[in-house]
Amino acid sequence: MQRSLDSLAGMATSAFGAGTSAAMRQATSPKTILEYIINFFTCGGVRRKNEAQYKELIDTMADTLKSSMPDRGAPLPENIILEDMDGCRVEFNLPGENNEAEQVIVRVSKGDHSETREIPLVSFEKICRVLLFRYEFSIPQDSVMLTAQGGMNLKGAVLTGANLTAENLCGADLSGADLDGAVLFMADCDGANLKGANLSGASLGDSNLMNACLEDTIMCGATLDRANLTGANLQHASLLGCSMVECLCSGANMEHANISGATLIRADMSGATLQGATIMAADMEGAILTRANLRKASFISTNLDGADLAEANLNNTCFKDCTLTHLRT
């Protein structure tokens, strides 16, 4: 019995104290020689059983939080109880009147026996917010809740038309996600992974996308006015018809991106890499391209009136039928 309680306490600590892929693997691996032997002869039976219990813990926690909170922005309850987890009671006691410690106390009990653990409050709150976020937007719960960097795991999530205004998505994994028509106005996506995501028609005005990975993203018709894309990776991104007025793209990597039809009036693209990029019928009036790498970029029927190309790399750059009046070089 003690070993069963210890195992469940370990799972709860890993799930709600770390929430990462590494934590899940460690918590669900066989622990004893006997478990390793059984796991071998059942082709991973022990691990599968542990993974099912781990997932049940997460699903039950999500349901409990949803039923006890008016909305996901509300304070977490000081005491959260998960009943009948494999015949056990799992209790999370947050700092407050009944817990003077700065940690969340996890207590797993069955009859007269119990096991106690402690987990960081910051990690616990972050994981609970992920569960509530996924619940609100009808995204199936996942055993991996956080990335190794501590961002939300939303890989492949369907968030079409979702209102994510001012949402904290720092370091989130949104690779392959569908954000068609989503509203991310003023969202903080610093360091987020959006590789291969669909952001067509999304509203990203005034958002923070510093150092975000937007490689291979589809952003046709998206609005990025005044967005901060400093240091972002936009290699092979499709930015057809995007509105990027006064967008900050300093140091961004836009190699082989398609920026045709985009509006980049007064955009700051200083030090950006646009090597091999396709820019057709774009409006780049007053754009700042100082020290930008424009090698082999193709500018066709693009308005570059008043643009600043001082110290830009123009090796094999093509300018065809472009407006180049008042150009600064």
Which stretches of residues belong to each language-model region?
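N-terminal leader/targeting signatures
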Residues: 12, 36-37, 88, 295, ...
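Residue-level detector of alpha-helical secondary structure
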Residues: 9, 34, 38, 42, ...
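Tandem repeat scaffolds
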Residues: 137-329
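Short linear elements at protein peripheries
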Residues: 50-103, 107-109
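Non-Sec secretion/translocation targeting segments of pathogen effectors
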Residues: 1-43
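N-terminal capping/linker segments that flank leucine-rich repeat
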Residues: 89-153
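Noncatalytic N-terminal accessory/assembly modules of large enzymes
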Residues: 44-48
